[in-house]
Amino acid sequence: MPKIAQIFNNNVALVDLDNRGQAVVRGRGIAFQKRRGDVIPTKQIEKIFYLANETSRQNLYFLLKNIPIDVVTTTYEIIDVAQKQYRLKVLDYIYITLSDHIYEAYKRYQAGTYQETMVPDFHIQYPAEYAVAKQALQIIATNLGVQFPQSEIKNLALHFINASGEDDGEQVFGKSNEASLSQLVQEVLKRHHITRSHSNGNYYDRFMIHLQYLIDRLQRVDTYAVTIVPEVATELKQNYPQSYKIASEIFDEIKDQLYRSMSEDERLYFIIHIQRLINEAPAQNHSQNDSL
């Protein structure tokens, strides 16, 4: 039976499982008037999110420093849907970036400052990711009580496209490589007068997190390879020429100075990050950019 390790609120708790590590459980009133060590009857648990390894536990505690538990469990539920219903393989950092995105969007929505962003639309090339994102809107509405516009599907889908891959367990970063890569990228950004600011801070930080996991993927021999659809490359280059230019500079310098074997797919991921950083409007519209 699950035993309480930590109570987050009346409805959410961290539990110890007999021989299966830990999990976050959610259910109406499951932790009400309970204490650490108390047993939670399994019939009261509505959702369970397993923490498979130390990285999963570290991600959870990192998130809880700044993000409400209801947003965190909503994110876990969305990723659970992606993995179980749609068989999507994603890297662990999506727990951080997606939680952060949902929370920031939630705060802006509540404050009346939410604005739709101009991001690429790839629902034809990535139907599963967009299906997850569409379902995510329903989960967010149910759990958090906010109804984002349909255009938010593009933002949510990009998180799954960007985090495509498969973790083999623990994340081990080479600190010297991480510092070199981060410095190189920041120097290119500064040449184009792009620095971290209040308005772009969230997108800037997500890009830096992507770079950390990029290093880890490049150091693995058995990296899970994801090939970007060719039409996406053409679409990005035509629609976002400035983002393409900056992203290509970053890609070329990393490849020349640090990692010659880097996949061409990374150039496209960089474009997506840069486009959000500078909020570049599309140079031309295509039928696939119509609302879903």
Curated annotation (Swiss-Prot):
GO MF entry, a single one: RNA binding
Annotated keywords: Activator, Repeat, RNA-binding, Transcription, Transcription regulation
Annotated ranges, domain PRD: 66-170, 172-284
GO biological process: positive regulation of DNA-templated transcription
Protein's UniProt keywords contain Transcription: yes
Claim: Transmembrane helix is one of the keywords in the record: no
Coiled coil: none
Biological role stated in the UniProt entry: Mediates positive regulation of the lac operon by functioning as an antiterminator factor of transcription.
PANTHER family assigned to the protein according to its UniProt record, in alphabetical order: CRYPTIC BETA-GLUCOSIDE BGL OPERON ANTITERMINATOR
Protein name in the entry: Transcription antiterminator LacT
Organism, as annotated: Lacticaseibacillus casei (Lactobacillus casei)
